[in-house]
Structures are given as C-alpha cells and as structure tokens.
C-alpha cells in the first residue's frame, strides 16, 4: 500500500515538473504556440504595434512590402505575423493582397494585409501609420492590446474605418 501511494506521488511530481518545463518553453518561444492555436479559428486576438520605414529608429523595414508594393504610410494597410501569412492569403511578392477586419478599442477598420513580420516580439500585427492613428489617434500608446483580426474572403473590400464592401454592408 505504501509503495502504491509513493508511486502515485512520484508520478504526480513528474507530471507537474514536465508541465512546468513545457510552459516555460512556450513562454521562451515568444507566444508562438498561443498564436498558432488562435490561428486555427476564424479570428486571432493579440497586440498590435506600428511600423513606418521612413521614421528613424531600429525598426526600419524598408520601402517595399512583402507583396512588392511600396510602403504607403497613408494607406489602410498592415503587416501580419510571418507565421500567420498562410491564413492571410500567403502575402507574397506579386500576389494580390488580402484584407482583414481589425477590431480594437471599440473601433473597426478594414485593412489590406500586404506585408509580413511584426518586428516586435509578441505582436500579431503591425499597422502602418494611418491605421495606427485610427486606433491610437495621438500615437501615444505605441501598442494596442486586445486587437481582433479576422481574415476577409474576396478581394473587393475597400480599406478604411468601416464594414462596407463597395456599397454593400455585410
């Protein structure tokens, strides 16, 4: 009887130790597992930051996007996390950009996903300057948390602060 209870305690201790090690490894990978799990559903939720290769700083990405378009700070556009590029139409050179509905802070905007790779760890999306000003008008926050990004099917969306699809309201 003592042997069985000792074995049970030992088994529980080993299970706990393995769980702690696995949790630490997930944290060390920068939330990649959490993002991958969220990507299996229709929408992903996480944090957003801003990028602009024309502003000084270490986060310069260059004037061209992954789709081959030139970066335009006045467009309603964003860069999706590299590991999620398949969910958002591939985002590759020469391909038509895809669109997403972005919701945060009680606001919504349709953005063109034409680039990849938020350079800041832990972010799921990087907004260009115009999109970030929609969610953070004074650019004071730097990061917008609780951003919900839903891929939109089709390519007839009009980017901007609305839910309209070329005259049709979904």
Model-flagged regions — what are they?
Residues 1-3:
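N-terminal secretory signal peptides that target proteins for export/translocation
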């Amino acid at each position: 009887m003592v042997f069985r209870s000792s074995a049970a305690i030992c088994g529980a201790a080993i299970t706990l130790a393995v769980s702690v090690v696995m949790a630490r490894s997930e944290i060390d990978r920068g939330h990649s597992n959490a993002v991958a799990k969220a990507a299996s559903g229709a929408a992903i939720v996480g944090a957003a930051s801003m990028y602009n290769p024309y502003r000084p700083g270490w986060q310069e990405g260059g004037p061209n996007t992954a789709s081959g378009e030139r970066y335009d700070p006045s467009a309603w556009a964003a860069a999706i996390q590299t590991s999620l590029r398949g969910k958002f139409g591939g985002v590759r050179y020469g391909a038509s950009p895809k669109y997403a509905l972005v919701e945060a802070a009680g606001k919504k905007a349709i953005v063109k996903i034409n680039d990849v790779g938020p350079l800041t760890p832990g972010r799921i999306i990087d907004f260009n300057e115009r999109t970030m000003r929609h969610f953070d008008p004074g650019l004071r926050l730097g990061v917008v948390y609780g951003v919900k990004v839903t891929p939109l099917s089709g390519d007839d969306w009009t980017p901007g602060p609305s839910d309209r699809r070329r005259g049709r309201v979904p």
